[in-house]
């Protein structure tokens, strides 16, 4: 009787075991594919100032210089691939491309040091424990901190922002929702040095952003413009979204990710509530397609949403997906699922759906195509008429990160993120 009961229970567990095995194979196949694509890209990416970013009209890889906001994603992708393969050649390439960015540790001209340094040197330190990398990261955190202003309670994003409504309207203390992503560098610096000033800067910025960047339903504004003298909000606008009052898809993705990460680092329940609210808003939108890959803005062409007169969104009817937003959101939701109890299944299931969509032929390029980038159909900025329906290096990075997080959950049921 005991044998029969045991056999019956074993039969019950077979479907779950098969599904888990199939999902592990799915992750493995995609990581093997990533290794092939990145190996091909390494042949084309030559020179110290040619960090892969997107493709040109002929479908060839286009690089950018180190002081752009995106150079950290390519070496970060190499590190994720090395982590999976253990390939020493990939580690050598990751090391080389990372160390090219060392001068950025002293860069103070914009806020993106988190993307630039933490995606590259952060992964490098995580996988090698090289003390020199830690020192570079701490110095980068010091450089980022110079852009914090106590009057606004924020880290200044760009040095100025020109409104899409009026070319004469220029704001001198813009803060964009993307900036939440750079706080991880500050939290890291406090963790490894014990200097709480980085932590205080990060949570002050997070609190100010939570107060001013969100509507009551947890949808986000893209750009908040502060008066640098009084610290008060002057305007709530968009740079890359459809309209000032719309919700730019990648901006909402940054928000979900940023507050999930901030909860991880602080364990403050306000940030968890915020991250869940932002994720719930995202997933419940009627404009979100069934494959969970959003259009570039959740409110394009909807009544009550009007682009600024200078924005290219005024003169185009393009309805395009932004696969980069889905990649970022998938990675964030895998993490958020681990903090959310019973709600976690909703977030994990959505992340799995996004990941499978991105890995489908609709979004994942054939080997050797797409300029050797992995993910197709991304949008940089329609208002600026740039990078429209192209691959983007950060879509690949967060696709890889989401795969790694899913792999950890399949193997261990939990994430190891520090």
Feature map (PLM): residue ranges:
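Glycan-recognition and catalytic cores of secretory/periplasmic carbohydrate-active enzymes
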Residues: 20-418
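Bacterial Sec-dependent N-terminal signal peptides
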Residues: 1-25
């Amino acid at each position: 009787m005991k044998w029969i009961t045991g056999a019956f229970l074993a039969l019950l567990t077979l479907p779950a075991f098969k599904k888990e095995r199939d999902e592990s194979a799915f992750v493995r196949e995609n990581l093997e594919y990533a290794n092939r694509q990145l190996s091909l890209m390494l042949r084309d990416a030559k020179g110290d100032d040619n960090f892969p970013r997107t493709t040109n009209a002929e479908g060839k890889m286009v690089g950018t210089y180190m002081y752009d906001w995106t150079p950290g994603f390519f070496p970060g992708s190499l590190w994720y691939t090395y982590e999976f393969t253990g390939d020493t050649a990939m580690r050598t390439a990751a090391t080389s491309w990372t160390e090219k960015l060392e001068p950025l540790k002293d860069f103070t001209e914009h806020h993106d040091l988190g993307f630039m340094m933490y995606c590259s040197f952060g992964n490098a330190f995580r996988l090698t424990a090289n003390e020199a990398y830690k020192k570079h990261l701490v110095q980068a955190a010091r450089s980022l901190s110079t852009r914090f202003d106590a009057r606004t309670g924020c880290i200044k994003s760009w040095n100025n922002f020109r409104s899409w409504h009026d070319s004469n309207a220029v704001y001198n203390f813009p803060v964009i929702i993307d900036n939440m992503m750079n706080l991880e560098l500050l939290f890291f610096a406090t963790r490894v040095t014990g200097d709480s000033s980085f932590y205080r800067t990060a949570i002050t910025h997070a609190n100010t952003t939570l107060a001013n960047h969100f509507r009551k339903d947890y949808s986000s504004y893209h750009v908040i413009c502060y008066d640098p003298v009084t610290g008060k909000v002057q305007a709530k606008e968009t740079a890359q979204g459809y309209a000032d009052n719309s919700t730019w898809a990648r901006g909402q993705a940054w928000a979900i990710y940023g507050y999930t990460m901030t909860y991880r680092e602080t364990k403050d329940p306000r940030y968890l509530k915020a991250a869940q609210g932002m994720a719930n808003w995202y997933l419940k939108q009627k404009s979100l397609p069934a494959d969970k890959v959003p259009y570039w803005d959740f409110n394009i062409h909807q009544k009550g949403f009007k682009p600024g007169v200078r924005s290219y969104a005024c003169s185009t009817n393009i309805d395009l997906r932004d696969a980069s937003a889905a990649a970022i959101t998938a990675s964030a939701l895998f993490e958020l699922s681990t903090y959310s109890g019973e709600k976690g299944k909703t977030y994990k299931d959505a992340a799995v759906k996004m990941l499978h969509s991105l890995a489908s032929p609709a979004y994942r390029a054939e080997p050797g195509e797409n300029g050797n980038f992995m993910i197709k159909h991304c949008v940089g900025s329609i208002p600026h008429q740039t990078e429209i329906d192209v691959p983007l290096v950060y879509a690949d990075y967060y696709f890889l990160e989401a795969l790694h997080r899913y792999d950890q959950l399949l193997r261990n049921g939990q994430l190891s993120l520090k």
